[in-house]
Amino acid sequence: MSLDKGTKEEITKKFQLHEKDTGSADVQIAILTEHITELKEHLKRSPKDQNSRLALLKLVGQRRKLLEYLNSTDTERYKNLITRLNLRK
């Protein structure tokens, strides 16, 4: 279960900090969030898929680490991103 190229490009354009930004924490977190959302939907349809469940936990951990990094380096960007992605923090 991976995001197609068009979806990634759309997310990148929406969250990039400048024109050529493709790897900032903001973009990575947004892509991970979309991927997590898709995996959650998949797990609703296939609750016995343990490999996808483990992949979901791994992605959530990656996103959590990136969010912690962003919060420690630029709190204002962190708060803005949390609001834009409708995350619970």
UniProtKB/Swiss-Prot annotation:
Q: Which GO terms describe its molecular function?
A: rRNA binding; structural constituent of ribosome
Q: One Pfam family for this entry, by name?
A: Ribosomal_S15
Q: Which GO terms describe its cellular component?
A: cytosolic small ribosomal subunit
Q: Which SUPFAM superfamilies match?
A: S15/NS1 RNA-binding domain
Asked whether the UniProt record includes Manganese among its keywords, one would answer no
**Organism's domain of life?**
Bacteria
Annotated GO biological processes are: translation
**Which of UniProt's keywords are assigned here?**
Ribonucleoprotein, Ribosomal protein, RNA-binding, rRNA-binding
The record's listing under InterPro entries reads: Ribosomal_uS15, Ribosomal_uS15_bac-type, uS15_NS1_RNA-bd_sf
What does the function comment of this entry state? Answer: One of the primary rRNA binding proteins, it binds directly to 16S rRNA where it helps nucleate assembly of the platform of the 30S subunit by binding and bridging several RNA helices of the 16S rRNA. Forms an intersubunit bridge (bridge B4) with the 23S rRNA of the 50S subunit in the ribosome.
Q: Which HAMAP family match?
A: Ribosomal_uS15_B (MF_01343_B)
Entry's NCBIfam families?
S15_bact (TIGR00952)
PANTHER family cross-referenced by the UniProt entry: RIBOSOMAL PROTEIN S15, BACTERIAL AND ORGANELLAR, SMALL RIBOSOMAL SUBUNIT PROTEIN US15M
Q: Which family does it belong to?
A: Belongs to the universal ribosomal protein uS15 family.
Question: What's the subunit arrangement here?
Answer: Part of the 30S ribosomal subunit. Forms a bridge to the 50S subunit in the 70S ribosome, contacting the 23S rRNA.
Query: What name does UniProt use for this protein?
Result: Small ribosomal subunit protein uS15
- The organism named in the record is Chlamydia caviae (strain ATCC VR-813 / DSM 19441 / 03DC25 / GPIC)
